Amino acid sequence: MTAPIRIALMGCQGRMGKALLEAIRANEQVTLGTALERPGSTVIGLDVGDLNGLGAMNVLIADDLEKVKDQFDVIIDFTRPEVTLKNLAFAVANNKRIVIGTTGFDDAGKAAINEAAKKIGIVFASNFSVGVNLVFKLLEQAAKVMGDYTDIEIIEGHHRHKVDAPSGTALSMGEVVAKTLGRDLKQCAVYGREGITGERDRNTIGFATIRAGDLVGEHTVMFADIGERVEITHKASSRLTFANGAVRAANWLKDQPCGLFDMQDVLNLK
């Protein structure tokens, strides 16, 4: 029997970190090798299981990957771009695979991820939900059939604490639609409208953002014509849906060579 893959969980006390901890604990194919928080945190040195009401897991929270590099095989990182890029550099230097769920990277950050994928295996996705990745495929079909003659709008909502907008998932949805239609999202995206905007340009893709309460994640892509519209919607009610997908990706990644992958690869949807 193959030994479980050992996970290094970054940001273990964040919202996604806690969901990932639960998902790792429930999955027999993986095990928690180490859990990390930022240097100076008051939780450093505590048992991550005891701290989260799960009982002792014999994993003490660390603050430096270098100190625990022999305790894991794959990193799961849902933190912030600047933190993830630092962890990515560590992964390359130490030949560790990494699953990246962090969003909000600029072009330089994305380029660094692409460069790292020449040396290690990386799963990088804006959304690890199976349902959202099915939506990506549905959007391709809708764009092929309706995209050239409808107005396309993407509306997304998340909790009040989310720091980037639009969400990485919304941008990925826009990329799927734009690519299918042969457009460049950077040129055709419209992020919010205010004042006298003039008539809508049919070739644009609009984005609207909601930040409120404890919304986990809601996305709707609208293809609107005169007299009818099609809306493709995904609503997440628990972060566990993303956490389970990320753990699934980590287990899948163990058998892959170096390269850049996403959840479409993990789910064999390509």
From Swiss-Prot:
Pathway: Amino-acid biosynthesis; L-lysine biosynthesis via DAP pathway; (S)-tetrahydrodipicolinate from L-aspartate: step 4/4. It is found in: Cytoplasm. CDD domains: DHDPR_N. The active site is at residues 158, 162. (S)-2,3,4,5-tetrahydrodipicolinate binds at residues 159, 168-169. GO terms for molecular function: 4-hydroxy-tetrahydrodipicolinate reductase; NAD binding; NADP binding; oxidoreductase activity, acting on CH or CH2 groups, NAD or NADP as acceptor. It catalyses: (S)-2,3,4,5-tetrahydrodipicolinate + NAD(+) + H2O = (2S,4S)-4-hydroxy-2,3,4,5-tetrahydrodipicolinate + NADH + H(+); (S)-2,3,4,5-tetrahydrodipicolinate + NADP(+) + H2O = (2S,4S)-4-hydroxy-2,3,4,5-tetrahydrodipicolinate + NADPH + H(+). NADP(+) binds at residue 38. Its EC number is 1.17.1.8. PANTHER family: 4-HYDROXY-TETRAHYDRODIPICOLINATE REDUCTASE 1, CHLOROPLASTIC-RELATED, DIHYDRODIPICOLINATE REDUCTASE. This is 4-hydroxy-tetrahydrodipicolinate reductase. It comes from Tolumonas auensis (strain DSM 9187 / NBRC 110442 / TA 4). The gene is dapB.
